């Protein structure tokens, strides 16, 4: 076993104007030979800790040693043996894959035969060999992360710090990244992987769980998960849909957390609560409730004190959408988009009914985003039709867009404007003026908890507040249809739950939602899902339908992520001769 370690002794970091330290005095030891996960919600202190370990931030008190080096006093020696991949890794998008590798090799002084051998090993390791001449900007999200990892590994570091490398990456690419990182750890490298995705944390041998700068837990994820035995349940009702059932359950004092899981509601009960407490609670309909296997996420949420929010205030301020329940409001007919001879979307067909949440899933580069952009009028189809409320977006885009709300990936907010200025700008774009505009800004600010930060520059906001603001901006004109492009990418489970409470309350009002996501637990909130691969719609149905389609002897009860990977594997096998 490699004896490389990170040791923290009372390590603390404070920033001016903050009541609490970004990282409270922290004592722990991190070993090599396996992947250690750094887990916590937005603002927990994960990135601050990473930056101190990399020597990019000076601690206010305490000390850290990284394989024997002080990150500040011995920065030169440390940087020779440390690889750090930040959230926004510095790839040069106008350079090719090989040109990026050459640049990082120059920076690391890797030359001659050593460079040649290193590149050969990394290109094989990352499967990027066939793409050395491709511009980095033209790579899919998963391939960019692999290239970022390859560039970080050019100098053959002994310590690897990865800050949320799985954000925006599809399940197949994430699995490949994990296989690569586990292989490196097995060779004796010390690896610290920061994440807000708790399914990733479950793959770590050891985790550090932080919240508000404090270390709440260090140990095996499995050990923390086992503390939740007898407290995780799946609930259904023959008389009520899962969204309404979730709203009722979250108001009960016996419930610590709840979320939609396919056709069921997943509940975490407080320590002394029993299923009978839920069955006999006031206002609950007839239910079926059965114990299920706990997950690390259940333990994480419980350790943080539960989900906290039980109801979205949006339901009280949004109007009910007029229209016939069950009528088709979004439709793709033989939808095709070609770039030269390449068909990014190839004769795709689907229909979305009023008041439904429809999810588009697919690997990076599969055509999912192209399809989504055509459906909300951001791309013109080569052939076929994208219809919204019966209107062809190619012919009636202006009229159709009056009924659409769009929340872009990475939120598309104006960072140099304040929160209120963003709300004023977007409401103005949607035609609101004067008193009506002021009232809508006030109501949305109240609903999303933005009033106290109205004068803050948007660039300075934590990710969770940016997400709230982006959703508020997209709802200023109270659209009938809402398009969400990876709306919770990189946010923590608490923020994700709050977001979906808002979405569920809107759907109860008749709003139709179309969403793209790489986060498979999020797909469970969808009524139906379309899986796009190689430009084609290869599967569609409810989350439970897709899981049933992918079930086999090895995986009789697959997760949504396992179903995603299996359905693509099955399609590849079936079309291997084409």
Curated annotation (Swiss-Prot):
Disruption phenotype: Mutant shows increased sensitivity to cefoperazone, a third-generation cephalosporin. The keyword Nucleotide-binding applies. Residues 6-237, 330-559 form the ABC transporter domain. The keyword ATP-binding applies. Induction: Repressed by the transcriptional regulator CecR. Keywords: ATP-binding, Nucleotide-binding, Repeat, Transport. Transmembrane segments: none annotated. ATP 2 binds at residues 362-369. InterPro entries: AAA+_ATPase, ABC_transporter-like_ATP-bd, ABC_transporter-like_CS, P-loop_NTPase. Part of the ABC transporter complex YbhFSR that could be involved in efflux of cefoperazone. Probably responsible for energy coupling to the transport system. The complex is probably composed of two ATP-binding proteins (YbhF) and two transmembrane proteins (YbhR and YbhS). Belongs to the ABC transporter superfamily. This is Probable multidrug ABC transporter ATP-binding protein YbhF. The gene is ybhF.
């Amino acid at each position: 076993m490699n004896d490389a370690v990170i040791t923290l002794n009372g390590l603390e970091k404070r920033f001016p104007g903050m009541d609490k330290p970004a990282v409270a005095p922290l004592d722990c030891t991190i070993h090599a030979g396996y992947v250690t996960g750094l887990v916590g919600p937005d603002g927990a202190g994960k990135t601050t800790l990473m930056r101190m370990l990399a020597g990019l931030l000076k601690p206010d008190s305490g000390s850290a040693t990284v394989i024997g080096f002080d990150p500040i006093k011995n920065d030169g020696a440390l940087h020779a043996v440390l690889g750090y991949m930040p959230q926004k890794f510095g790839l040069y998008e106008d350079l090719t894959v090989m040109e990026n590798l050459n640049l990082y090799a120059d920076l690391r002084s890797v030359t001659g035969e050593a460079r040649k051998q290193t590149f050969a090993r990394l290109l094989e390791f990352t499967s990027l060999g066939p793409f050395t001449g491709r511009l980095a900007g033209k790579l899919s999200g998963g391939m960019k992360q692999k290239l970022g990892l390859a560039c970080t590994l050019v100098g053959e570091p002994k310590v690897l710090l990865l800050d949320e490398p799985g954000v925006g990456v599809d399940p197949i690419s994430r699995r490949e990244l994990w296989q690569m990182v586990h292989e490196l750890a097995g060779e004796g490298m010390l690896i610290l992987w920061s994440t807000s995705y708790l399914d990733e944390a479950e793959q770590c041998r050891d985790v550090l769980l932080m919240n508000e700068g404090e270390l709440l837990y260090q140990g095996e994820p499995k050990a923390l998960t086992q503390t939740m035995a007898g407290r995780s349940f799946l609930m259904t009702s023959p008389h009520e849909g899962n969204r309404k059932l979730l709203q009722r359950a979250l108001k009960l004092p016996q419930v610590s957390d709840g979320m939609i899981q396919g056709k069921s509601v997943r509940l975490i009960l407080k320590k002394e609560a029993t299923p009978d407490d839920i069955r006999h609670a006031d206002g609950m309909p007839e239910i079926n409730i059965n114990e299920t296997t706990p997950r690390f996420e259940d333990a994480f949420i419980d350790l943080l004190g539960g989900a906290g929010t039980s109801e979205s205030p949006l339901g009280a301020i949004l109007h009910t959408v007029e229209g016939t329940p069950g009528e088709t409001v979004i439709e793709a007919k033989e939808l095709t988009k070609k770039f030269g001879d390449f068909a990014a979307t190839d004769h795709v067909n689907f229909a979305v009914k009023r008041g439904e949440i429809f999810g588009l899933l697919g690997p990076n580069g599969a055509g999912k985003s192209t399809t989504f952009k055509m459906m909300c009028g951001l791309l013109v189809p080569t052939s076929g039709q994208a219809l919204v409320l019966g209107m062809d977006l190619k012919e009636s885009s202006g009229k159709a867009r009056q009924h659409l709300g769009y929340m872009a990936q990475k939120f598309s907010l104006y960072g140099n404007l304040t929160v209120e200025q963003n709300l004023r700008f977007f409401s103005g774009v949607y035609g609101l003026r004067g008193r009506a505009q002021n009232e809508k800004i006030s109501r949305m600010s109240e609903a999303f908890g933005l009033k106290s930060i109205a004068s803050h520059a948007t660039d300075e906001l934590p990710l969770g507040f940016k997400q709230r603001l982006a959703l508020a901006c997209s709802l200023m004109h109270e659209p009938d249809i809402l398009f969400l492009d990876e709306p919770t990418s990189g946010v923590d489970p608490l923020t994700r739950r709050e977001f979906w409470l808002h979405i569920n309350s809107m759907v109860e009002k008749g709003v139709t939602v179309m969403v793209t996501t790489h986060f498979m637990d999020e797909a469970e909130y969808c009524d139906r899902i379309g899986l796009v691969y190689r430009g084609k719609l290869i599967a569609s149905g409810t989350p439970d339908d897709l899981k049933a389609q992918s079930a086999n002897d090895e995986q009789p009860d697959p997760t949504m992520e396992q179903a995603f990977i299996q359905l693509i594997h099955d399609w590849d096998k079936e079309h291997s001769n084409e």
